[in-house]
C-alpha cells in the first residue's frame, strides 16, 4: 500500500473521459500536486459541466471524446459502466493509433473488456476507488493487465494516489473482493452510524447529541486503527473489560452473528460485482450501451 503522494505527478497530458465527481476529485488532486491545467483535457457531454470544470480548474474541456484524447498518453475513463462499451467503441480507432495507458474507474469493468472494446493491444489499468476519494481520503485498488509496463503502473499509481492510498492487486479476480472490502464499504460504515444514532435517540438522547457522539467516535476509532499500528482485535480487547458495558455490547453482537452477517454481505457484494461484469459483456454484445 502507498500513502497519498505529495510530490508532483509525472509529466504528460492526461485526458479524462467523463467529468463527474470522481474526475473532479482527481483533477483537483493532480493540479494540487503540480500538474499544469493545460496538460489536463476533459470530455463531458453537459455544457454546464464543461463550464464548471473550466471555471474551477482552468482545464481544457471538449464535447467530443476524440478531441479530448488527442495528444494524451493517459486516458482516464470515469463514465458509468453501462455507457463504457459505446464510449470505448468511439475511441477504438484513436486508441489503436495512440497506444495510450487506459485507466478505468468504472465499477465492474474488467481489463479484458476494456481492451476488447478499445480494439485490442491496449495497456489497461482497472481501478476501484471509494467515495472518500472525493475528499482525498479514500483508497483505490488497482490491477494492471500484462501490457502495462512499470512506468505505466507508476503513472497510474501517481494519478490515483492524489485521492488517497493505493493497493495493487496481482489477480484481477480479486478486484470484486476489493469492491466488497472498500469500494462498497463506506456504506457499511454509514449504516452502522445510522443504526447507532437511531439506538441512541431511542434511549432518549437528543438527535444532535447522538450524531456528534456517534460520528466523533467513528472518526476517533478510525484514527486509532490507522495510527496505533495495532490490529482491530487487539484494540477491541483493550477496551473490553470483562463484565463491563463494552463487554455486554460486544457479546450481544457476537451472539447475534455479526461476523457471519458481515461475511455474507461482503460475499454478496463480490458476487454482484461478478454478475455486473458478465452483464457488461451481454450489453456490449447486444450493441446497446444503454
Locations of regions flagged by a protein language model:
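Catalytic, metal-anchored helix/loop core of enzyme active sites in primary metabolism
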Residues: 181, 193, 279-282
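NAD(P)-dependent Rossmann-like dehydrogenase/reductase catalytic/cofactor-binding core
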Residues: 2, 8, 215-290
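NAD(P)+-binding Rossmann beta1-loop-alpha1 motif at the extreme N-terminus of oxidoreductases
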Residues: 1-71, 201-203
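Short pre-catalytic strand/loop immediately N-terminal to key active-site residues, enriched for Gly-Thr
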Residues: 14, 125, 174-180, 232-237
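Internal alpha-helical scaffold of NAD(P)-dependent oxidoreductase catalytic cores
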Residues: 113-123, 139-177, 188-227, 272
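Rossmann-like NAD(P)(H) cofactor-binding subdomain of soluble oxidoreductases
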Residues: 26-27, 47, 57, 65-142, ...
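Small-residue helix-packing motif on alpha-helices
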Residues: 40, 50, 68, 114, ...
Amino acid at each position: 500500500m502507498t500513502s497519498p503522494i505529495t510530490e508532483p505527478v509525472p509529466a504528460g497530458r492526461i485526458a479524462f473521459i467523463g467529468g463527474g465527481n470522481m474526475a473532479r476529485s482527481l483533477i483537483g488532486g493532480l493540479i494540487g500536486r503540480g500538474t499544469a491545467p493545460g496538460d489536463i483535457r476533459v470530455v463531458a457531454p453537459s455544457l454546464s459541466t464543461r463550464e464548471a470544470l473550466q471555471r474551477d480548474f482552468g482545464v481544457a474541456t471538449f464535447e467530443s471524446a476524440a478531441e479530448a484524447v488527442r495528444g494524451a498518453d493517459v486516458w482516464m475513463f470515469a463514465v458509468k459502466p453501462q455507457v463504457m462499451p459505446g464510449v470505448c467503441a468511439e475511441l477504438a480507432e484513436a486508441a489503436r493509433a495512440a497506444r495510450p495507458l487506459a485507466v478505468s474507474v468504472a465499477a465492474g469493468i474488467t481489463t479484458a473488456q476494456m481492451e476488447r472494446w478499445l480494439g485490442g493491444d491496449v495497456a489497461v489499468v482497472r481501478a476501484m476507488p471509494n467515495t472518500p476519494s472525493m475528499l482525498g481520503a479514500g483508497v483505490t485498488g488497482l490491477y494492471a493487465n500484462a501490457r502495462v509496463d512499470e512506468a505505466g503502473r507508476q503513472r497510474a499509481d501517481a494519478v490515483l494516489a492524489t485521492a488517497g492510498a493505493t493497493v495493487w492487486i496481482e489477480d484481477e479476480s480479486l478486484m470484486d473482493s476489493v469492491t466488497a472490502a472498500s469500494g462498497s464499504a463506506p456504506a457499511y460504515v454509514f449504516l452502522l452510524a445510522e443504526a447507532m444514532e437511531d439506538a441512541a435517540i431511542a434511549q432518549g438522547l437528543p438527535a444532535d447529541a447522538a450524531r456528534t457522539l456517534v460520528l466523533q467516535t467513528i472518526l476517533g476509532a478510525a484514527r486509532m486503527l490507522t495510527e496505533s499500528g495495532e490490529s482491530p482485535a487487539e484494540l477491541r480487547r483493550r477496551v473490553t473489560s470483562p463484565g463491563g458495558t463494552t463487554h455486554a455490547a460486544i457479546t450481544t453482537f457476537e451472539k447475534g452473528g455479526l461476523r457471519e452477517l458481515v461475511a455474507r454481505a461482503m460475499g454478496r457484494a463480490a458476487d454482484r460485482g461478478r454478475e455486473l461484469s458478465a452483464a457488461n459483456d451481454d450489453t456490449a454484445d447486444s450493441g446497446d450501451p444503454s
